[in-house]
Structure formats: structure tokens, C-alpha cells
């Protein structure tokens, strides 16, 4: 299903529902959710906190790019057996390599944005993590696209899987989609000319980074847009 269709909720809610019924090992990791980026891991963790607010389910987010204090906090959550572990592949492998993480009781293994993980080169990491998991488990892959490499991964780590596809959503009829092929230095000029032709009342502009957002904002102020 496409990005933004609720795939994360579609995996968190059923898992929490199952855990709330009981029958799963206490003080053990029961679910591992893999995320391609730290930002997505943080987002899933926030949603997890919201969905599980009134449930006796614990979670820990494990992702890179932090100091030693954060690493120790992750270690504590992993060794105490948080019900749900939300992790980026590289960071989880770092903990696994130190020998204190037990994934032998995991019942649910979820790959969120599996296509992005493969695009970022995490295929070998995923296969390495799978080796720590029990054979008797439910494995679920969520992906916006289904290229050949995703289908191959599914055949490798899934057992007789069911494939569910949601129809591709289309923009409203009144929306006009246009693509401009240009150099980086030409982008602001193109936007300026578009605004001069027809000044819009409301605009949403997406940028690739926080720094780029600041640069674009400053440029627009200079242009008095």
C-alpha cells in the first residue's frame, strides 16, 4: 500500500491486541519491528506509546546516531525484555553482537517500509537478524512497492505468505500534476515564476532536509513571497 495509508497502525494495533490477550512470555521480547531510518523508528515509537497507553505492554526504540547514554538505555530495555522492540537494522545488530539480547521468544517480526530497507542496503542485515529469531513466528512485511527484490525477500523469510494489495489512490480530479526537470539552482526561479503567474492562497512546499527548509524560507523572504 502507498505511503500514508496507515500501514504502521495496521501492524501495531493487531500486535497490541494479541499481546493484551495474554499467553505470551513475560519479561521477554515478543515483537520486533524493523524500520529503515531513525526518524521512522521514532515515529513508530510515538504511535506505540499512544496506542498502548491503557495496555500493559512495554516498548523500546533502538536506533543509531546517539550517545553512549542512549545506548545504555536501549540495552536496559532489551535485557529487561520489552514486549515490542522498534529498531533500525544496524543498531539492533550492534546490540545482538554483544550477546545480551534474546530474540528466541519473538512471536511477531515486522518489516515496516521493507522496500526502503532494501534500497538502503539492509538486506544482509535483515537476514542476519532473522537467524536470531525462532522458526515459529509470524512475519509481516509492509511495503509501498513490490519490486522483484521484495518478492525474493518474501520468499526467503516468509512461509507460504498471503499477499494483500490496496488499490493505488489517485489525486482529486481538479489537481494538476506537473514535473519540472531542472538543476538545483533553477528551482527557486521556477517557483517564483509560478507564483507570479497565479498567486496561490495556500501552499505546501516539501524540502529534503531541515537545512533546506531554512534556505528556501530565507530565499522566499528575499523574494517577498
Residue spans of the language-model regions?
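Conserved helicase RecA-like core
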Residues: 1-225
Amino acid at each position: 500500500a502507498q505511503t500514508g495509508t496507515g500501514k504502521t497502525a495496521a501492524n501495531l494495533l493487531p500486535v497490541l491486541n494479541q499481546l493484551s490477550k495474554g499467553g505470551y512470555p513475560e519479561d521477554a521480547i515478543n515483537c520486533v519491528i524493523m524500520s529503515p531510518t531513525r526518524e521512522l523508528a521514532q515515529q513508530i515509537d510515538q504511535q506505540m506509546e499512544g496506542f498502548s497507553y491503557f495496555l500493559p505492554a512495554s516498548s523500546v526504540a533502538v536506533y543509531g546516531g546517539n550517545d553512549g547514554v542512549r545506548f545504555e538505555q536501549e540495552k536496559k530495555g532489551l535485557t529487561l525484555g520489552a514486549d515490542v522492540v522498534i529498531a533500525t537494522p544496524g543498531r539492533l545488530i550492534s546490540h545482538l553482537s554483544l550477546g545480551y539480547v534474546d530474540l528466541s521468544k519473538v512471536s511477531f517480526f515486522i518489516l515496516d517500509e521493507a522496500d526502503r530497507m532494501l534500497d538502503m542496503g539492509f538486506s544482509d542485515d535483515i537476514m542476519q537478524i532473522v537467524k536470531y529469531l525462532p522458526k515459529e513466528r509470524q512475519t509481516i512485511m509492509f511495503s509501498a512497492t513490490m519490486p522483484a527484490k521484495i518478492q525474493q525477500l518474501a520468499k526467503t523469510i516468509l512461509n507460504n505468505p498471503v499477499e494483500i494489495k490496496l488499490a493505488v489512490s489517485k489525486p482529486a480530479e481538479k489537481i494538476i500534476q506537473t514535473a519540472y526537470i531542472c538543476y538545483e539552482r533553477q528551482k527557486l526561479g521556477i517557483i517564483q515564476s509560478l507564483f507570479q503567474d497565479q498567486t496561490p492562497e495556500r501552499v505546501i512546499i516539501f524540502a529534503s532536509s531541515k537545512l533546506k527548509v531554512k534556505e528556501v524560507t530565507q530565499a522566499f523572504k528575499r523574494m517577498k513571497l
